[in-house]
């Protein structure tokens, strides 16, 4: 198996072919995901909730991310591996560079950071120093205390325009990918069409170039509130490997996410 690259994802965008990605936190699931055809994985700070049992992502540290990144890389040596920089790990460009180095030494190919055009200088600095960056806009969980909860973003025109401007600014600064979370389908379409870099959606309809799900949502083992955009593929498929294959197939065909998983 050849490694998945950002160039391959760009070609998929150019040819209109969708791709599936998923969060991974350990060796065994990462190995399963790669064996069943997932080429892009994220060691997300969502591990604070799904693995550590916190009520938000805020307690997660760089050391936590690095630990899980090493485990995932051992299980999936060929995947394009993204790693979140957690809360307050990129408050300054210098801090972002130091912490990016830590997670890349652990095996990440790219770091993901949450925020808009105010991060352009950080993205530019990291890119110039050979650290590929994935942006993250819309509902950014590290900002949950600012948003007042987990809410759909960009529903009015002013907010939508701000998100579009943020996306363009991140791309201009050198971002290689963009995650777009919990935004109306029409806005996701505008942003996906406006950018030359691949856009990965979660709660953004089936109009983005790729999709990502938290693995616990895909297997129906999330405790507490289940997001509208989540689908339990395990319930339909019957076993984990078949569930992963079904997830990939439905993303590639555009069947998932459906209208019932989308916001307007």
Swiss-Prot record:
SUPFAM superfamilies, A to Z: Phosphoenolpyruvate/pyruvate domain (SSF51621)
Cofactor annotation remark: Binds 1 Mg(2+) ion per subunit.
EC number(s) given by UniProt: 2.1.2.11
GO molecular function: 3-methyl-2-oxobutanoate hydroxymethyltransferase activity; magnesium ion binding
Pathway membership, UniProt: Cofactor biosynthesis; (R)-pantothenate biosynthesis; (R)-pantoate from 3-methyl-2-oxobutanoate: step 1/2
Keywords, alphabetical: Cytoplasm, Magnesium, Metal-binding, Pantothenate biosynthesis, Transferase
Keyword ATP-binding: no
Catalyzed reactions: 3-methyl-2-oxobutanoate + (6R)-5,10-methylene-5,6,7,8-tetrahydrofolate + H2O = 2-dehydropantoate + (6S)-5,6,7,8-tetrahydrofolate
Domain of life: Bacteria
Necessary cofactors: Mg(2+)
Chief location of this protein within or outside the cell: cytoplasm
Active site residues according to the UniProt entry: 181
Enzyme class: transferase
Assembly information from the UniProt record: Homodecamer; pentamer of dimers.
Chain's role: Catalyzes the reversible reaction in which hydroxymethyl group from 5,10-methylenetetrahydrofolate is transferred onto alpha-ketoisovalerate to form ketopantoate.
Cited NCBIfam families: panB, PRK00311.1
UniProt name for this protein: 3-methyl-2-oxobutanoate hydroxymethyltransferase
Taxonomic path: Bacteria, Pseudomonadati, Pseudomonadota, Gammaproteobacteria, Enterobacterales
């Amino acid at each position: 198996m050849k490694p998945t690259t950002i160039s391959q994802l760009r070609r998929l965008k150019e040819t209109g072919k969708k791709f599936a990605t998923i969060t991974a936190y350990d060796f065994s699931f990462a190995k399963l995901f790669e064996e069943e055809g997932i080429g892009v994985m994220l060691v997300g700070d969502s591990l604070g909730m799904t693995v550590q049992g916190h009520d938000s992502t805020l307690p997660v540290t760089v050391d936590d991310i690095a630990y899980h990144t090493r485990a995932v890389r051992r299980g999936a040596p060929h995947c394009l591996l993204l790693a979140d920089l957690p809360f307050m790990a990129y408050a300054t460009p210098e801090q972002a560079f130091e912490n990016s180095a830590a997670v890349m030494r652990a095996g990440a190919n790219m770091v993901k950071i949450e925020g808009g055009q105010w991060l352009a200088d950080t993205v530019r600095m990291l890119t110039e120093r050979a650290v590929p960056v994935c942006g993250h806009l819309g509902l950014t969980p590290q900002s949950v205390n600012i948003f007042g909860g987990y809410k759909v973003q960009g529903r009015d025109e002013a907010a939508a325009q701000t998100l579009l401007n943020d996306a363009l600014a991140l791309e201009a600064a050198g971002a290689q990918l963009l995650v777009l979370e919990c935004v109306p389908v029409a806005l996701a379409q505008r942003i996906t069409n406006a950018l030359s870099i691949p856009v990965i959606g979660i709660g953004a309809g089936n109009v983005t170039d790729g999709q990502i799900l938290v693995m616990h949502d895909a297997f129906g083992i999330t405790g507490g509130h289940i997001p509208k955009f989540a689908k339990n593929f395990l319930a339909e498929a019957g076993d984990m490997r078949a569930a992963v294959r079904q997830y990939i197939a439905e993303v590639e065909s555009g069947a998932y996410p459906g209208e019932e998983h989308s916001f307007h």
